Amino acid sequence: MTQHWPAGEIARMILDGFDDYREHFRRITLGARERFEQARWQDIQRAAAARINLYEQKVGEVNGWLRDGFDEEVLLEVEQWPLVKSAYIRLIDPRLDDELAETWYNSLFCSLFSHDQISDGCMFIHTTRPSIRSHERAAQTRTYMPDGSLKGLVRAIFRDYAFDYGDLESDLSRLEEQLRDCLPDWVCKDPALAVELFVPVLYRNKGAYLVGRLYNSDEQWPLVIPLLHREGHGIEADALITDEAEVSIIFSFTRSYFMVDVPVPAEFVNFLKRILPGKHIAELYTSIGFYKHGKSEFYRALINHLASTDDRFIMAPGVRGMVMSVFTLPGFNTVFKIIKDRFSPSKTVDRATVIDKYRLVKSVDRVGRMADTQEFADFRFPRGKFEPECLAELLEVAPSTVAVEGDTVLVRHCWTERRMIPLNLYLEQASEGQVLEALEDYGLAIKQLAAANIFPGDMLLKNFGVTRHGRVVFYDYDEISYLTEVNFRHIPPPRYPEDEMSGEPWYSIGPHDVFPEEFPPFLFADMGQRRLFSRLHGELYDADYWKGLQASIREGKVIDVFPYRRKGR
């Protein structure tokens, strides 16, 4: 029977499905320039969500093809799937997106088989792609030399990256000035100075980005030039950024995914890795929309870390969650979040609602203020990789999710997020200046989320974290909702003097009612922090402020949230 088993046909059908997915993905991506040039901001948001949802949609379609095309008993004969893998390897070897094709195959395998049938013999737990490939080319870039004139250098760049600029001469003068401010004088005068830019433009939300590097014979600097569309005034170059930390934030895990046409994804990711060496390739793949492959690279990094270190899982620092239990590896910059079997009495959500909320985050504009998540099923870890106290707590609070099978710990379902310092813990150790900066950014995070039609729900300090760049980011999603679903109210005046002394409200409260006047004691036990936040962001305590945001959203307005400092604006 083995010699007649349709391994090649199954492999071909899986790859045909991948080609179909890539074609639809590219079609959405290639529309980004037109949407940007025509200022179709709401279409941009819809396209971003559609492209994210496309992957699972296409996996489902190909699963149906396979089940319709082959006898189920034959198709699900897992012992034969090493033959499918071998046939598939031969098919993808000549491709320029072969690493993505491996991840696609894995997704199809997991859609057909239970996770206890996963093995490297049947699927690509470890990649088969060589680090250096015979078909690998230099990245698709353009190189520019100043030839004694920085303005001439900038002009040459914008000659190649042609848009309907509103006032290009003004832009060129400003960018030349910013370039001189960014680099030491000797670098600006260095005859060996050059600029290398990736040819395709990156698009995201209301911006377009030219991405590359400045370099001479000794050093290099990342280079990003954001373009904005000023409605009625044309396209303008908004800034010139060479600071690695700022460029890293532009590619942050808190941002929506870029739309950029990359026929050879590994080339571009390697190019980005050269200018952002602190970024893991999983994050770089994710940042350009290949979030499933980012998940594959994350998993490979995790199993490599577990195999090569003595690190053990511990409970994550901070206040224990009422809905989620969170654990981490000290040497691996990630937290693992599982849903508890029983929630605290004050929580009215159920498990299905929590899952929906976390999945919602993937498809909305996170405006740099919500951590991206990856959802996993059936993680298996060596029992010896858990500290006993950590494993005991997980088994106690989530026995339906965490189980011990011999020497293996099975985690049936979890999310991963980037690890941050919880804001409440950060403030306990912060200097006066750091407290001021953190509370300023905390309020700004709430405002930016709200303007993007996201209401965090539970805005306690413990539900926000501080990144390595000092940015405040929201990461607890079990109570998020669209801002337009919330009914913001003023507290009605008391009917009688006794009302104010009562422990019960004298007014009715609906399920979606929120009273911003109640925020101060709810958010801040520390009176000094409460007064400081009121001075910085007191409008957040006014129901009319929130209603004004809702009105803007209902009018179709899309806010500007810049992932970089806007110098000279």
Curated annotation (Swiss-Prot):
ATP binds at A316, P317, G318, V319, R320, G321, M322, K337. Keywords: ATP-binding, Cytoplasm, Glyoxylate bypass, Hydrolase, Kinase, Nucleotide-binding, Protein phosphatase, Serine/threonine-protein kinase, Transferase, Tricarboxylic acid cycle. Transmembrane segments: none annotated. The keyword Transmembrane helix does not apply. GO terms for molecular function: [isocitrate dehydrogenase (NADP+)] kinase activity; AMP binding; ATP binding; phosphoprotein phosphatase activity; protein serine/threonine kinase activity. Its main location: cytoplasm. It is found in: Cytoplasm. The active site is at D372. It catalyses: L-seryl-[isocitrate dehydrogenase] + ATP = O-phospho-L-seryl-[isocitrate dehydrogenase] + ADP + H(+). Coiled coil: none annotated. Its EC number is 2.7.11.5, 3.1.3.-. Belongs to the AceK family. This is Isocitrate dehydrogenase kinase/phosphatase. It comes from Pseudomonas putida (strain W619).
